[in-house]
Amino acid sequence: MLGALFIAMLTAITVWWLLIQRLKDKPWTKQGVLPTSQDTVTSSAPKVGLWVFLAVVSSLFGLFASAYMMRVGGHGGLVPWQALDEPNVLWINTLVLVLASGAMQIARNRIDADDFTGGRSYFLAAGLLTVVFLAGQAFAWQQARAGGNVGPGSPAYAFFVLLTAVHGLHLIGGLWVLGRTTARIFRGVEANNVVARSRIRLSVELCTTYWHWLLLVWLGVFALLLST
């Protein structure tokens, strides 16, 4: 039951966020020019690709959540389920990821306002905070293993590592894109090229959407872990 609710929550949040971003996306109000049909197609293709990707990965996390709840209920395993004491550092990690998502949003707002220098600083801050979050997650694995109430081979510990690792891998992939976008920002600020800056805005928008989505997924995963 909780697994189905988790799937429904992720789907609803994803759809809501995408609709909000779609309504807020008014490229004709930027720079005082109307977009051409080619510009619209060029900017829409990456957004559609990201939305499809988010929907697919949301389903993946939903399946993991369903498997988790089935295993908690005693299905499909010989080893009895023993709850894991969640490491306290997860609360700090959650706050760090919230700050990273907030920094990413500020970076987008600054860059949309043509403040590329200020936006660049917040964009880099978001990346650094994300690295801190990943380091904190690795430390959480060590804390969970040394907790004493479950062994490293227990189902609870295995699911804990699985859920946090899959989420972390998606963040690492996002950091790769963030690095490329940061390089574009530096080049765009120096070149002062209209086309380059337009592409930077699109890249930052996609990164911001992705970071917000990963924050929402982590909140769902964390709530799932705490509930059991």
Which residues make up each language-model segment?
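...captures the hydrophobic TM-helix bundle architecture rather than a specific catalytic motif
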Residues: M1-T228
